[in-house]
Amino acid sequence: MRAGNDLGSGRIGVLVGRIALPSMLAQFISVLYSIVDRIFIGQIPGEGALALAGAGVCGPVVTMVGSVAFLVGVGGAPLLSIKRGEGDDDAARGILANCFLMLCVFSVALPAAILPFREPMLRLFGASDATYSYAEAYFTLYLLGTPFALLASGLNQFIVCQGFAADGMKSVVLGAVLNIVLDPVFIFAFGLGVRGAAIATVLSQLASCVYAVRFLLGKKPPIRITRGGYSAAVMRRVLTLGFSPFIIIALDNVMIIAMNAVLQHYGGAARGDALVTCATIAQSFMLVVTMPLGGITGGTQSILSYNYGAYRTERVRQAQKYIFGLGLAFTAVMTLAARLAGPLFVRLFTTDEALAAQAFDTIKVCTLALLPLGLQYEVVDGFTALGLAKLALPLSLWRKAVYFAAVFALPAFFGADAVFYAEPISDVLGPLASVAVYCVCIRCEYSCRMRKPEREG
């Protein structure tokens, strides 16, 4: 793919499709890392349900690693694209060098800081006495593979932002296919159970990591990994812009923890573990929605950033129209899929009739408001692509605040099952605020951007 010139001169509709679709597919495939693990874990004879609940408790760990990768990757990639749009490739190289260093440091510091506290953390995440051993086994091994996961996910942003969406997809596909192959081998053939699932995931992430590093050291991308030029100011700018997606994903952690804790509290000994298992299955389906949706809106950030940096705001406007359309079309399809294919999806995780019926009901509730969620993603990711974290962050925090309020309020009045309605409530009230702010602010931002080169001239 011709990265540099196409971002500034290719037909917008074709360009959006060429970058959005591979990015969406890559994110869909990346979901397989967690979903395939859960599918195979749920089929372990005699202990599938408890093992699945234990692995679900580890969801915040996976999310935590992803949030740190986004802190650097999503913080640095738009800045790199903007600098390329301005024609300043030296500054773009400096941004990538600083981001690579930060990813390396975080990949060592994160597991070192967390591992000593794994037992209280897992208890906080919602592990019961019955599920703790499964959660601890998966948690420990997955965390030891953090360097591979961080580098693979973080560096992939810098592959996609240079226009190489297909190559970014290859990195993800490599790891996902390897995970599908290795999971049954380690879980069943070697008899390692939950530990086998974690080992398969770590090895798969290692493969993706090696691919991403080799690509960014090779001759194909115009901006490659280099040494030197490290700057605290550059790192600060990256972390400032990346803080919005980081805090949002980190809050997803807290959301999972809060939901599991509330379900255990209101479900009690009789229903707590079953409700957590239902939540794990529903969260897996929501990943099938939100990860590809994020691929559409996040992958196309390079188009917005590059043209914004080149002062071509009309191309930015056109691109956003296509991105909004793609997001709405995707969420409409997934709303139908939740109702038509939901029972089949649930059966991948459990053969228990009662649990399957309850999990399907949970999925239907959680997907009631997917359409407005598509608008939320594009508004927030669009503001991030333009370097406007001051707008992106409050809008994201507002949606999370609505979610938290509903998680704690609903079950107090309507029982444990009502907690699942927190998702559609936040998916309506969040986008309403985001669209309102977008309509008010975006035209002013474009006008200010176009006046800047006139003043410089």
Language-model region placement:
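Short alpha-helical transmembrane segments in multi-pass integral membrane proteins
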Residues: 1-22, 80-147, 189-243, 304-369, ...
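N-terminal transmembrane alpha-helices
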Residues: 7-39, 43-47, 60-75, 79, ...
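Residue-level signal for transmembrane alpha-helical positions in Major Facilitator Superfamily
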Residues: 17, 32-33, 72, 113-117, ...
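Transmembrane helical elements of multi-pass membrane transporters/channels
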Residues: 18-37, 141, 175, 204-208, ...
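Helix-terminus/linker motif at the lipid-water interface of multi-pass membrane proteins
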Residues: 28, 32-53, 122-129, 185-191, ...
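Alpha-helical transmembrane segments of multipass membrane proteins
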Residues: 35-39, 112, 120, 154-158, ...
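Small-residue-rich hydrophobic transmembrane alpha-helices
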Residues: 52-112, 149-168, 276-336, 340-342, ...
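Short runs within selected transmembrane alpha-helices of multi-pass transporters and secretion channels
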Residues: 142-160, 171-176, 197-212, 293-297, ...
